[in-house]
Amino acid sequence: MQVIRHQDRDSAGLVGLGARVLLLAPLANEALFRRIAGLGGRVDLEVELYSALDALINDPADWDLFVMDCDAFGGLEAGRRAFAMLGLAAERVPMILASAGCQTQVFPEDRRAPILLRAPATATSLRVAMEHALHNRLNFRF
């Protein structure tokens, strides 16, 4: 008989499994960093908006996912502006925008559109968002 006991309540499984994630968030948002890492993502934290956008635009192939804590940078509209500034890089790197101002979570069929999450993102909502964003990557992993 096997008994499996789940200890980590912030983690919901390793859906990110080695995915390189650029997280744009203030240093104070440790929970989001830990949740992404707990889902298997290799997280690089950036605290400055234009530095993060520069990293994505200059080498989009280096990243599997971009996650932005919009509330620290002016809300959901700031996240949408950042998405628009990415231009063609936004088509290559899936984007998750987390904001307390998000009324309805959105998981768009168009893979080029950003995923919208209500902040603070729970382990479950983040897992679903990462599965959705990394869907094509997950299909080719096996």
Model-derived features with residue positions:
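Conserved phosphate-coordination/catalytic loops
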Residues: 2-5, 46-50, 77, 120
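Short, charged/polar "capping" segments at the starts of alpha-helices
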Residues: 28-33, 75-76, 102-107
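Short amphipathic alpha-helical segments
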Residues: 34-35, 57, 78-80, 108-110
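Short hydrophobic/Thr-rich beta-strand motif most characteristic of the beta2 strand and flanking loop
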Residues: 41-49, 55
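Output/docking surface of receiver
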Residues: 45-47, 96-139
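Conserved phosphotransfer microenvironments
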Residues: 53, 62-92, 100-103
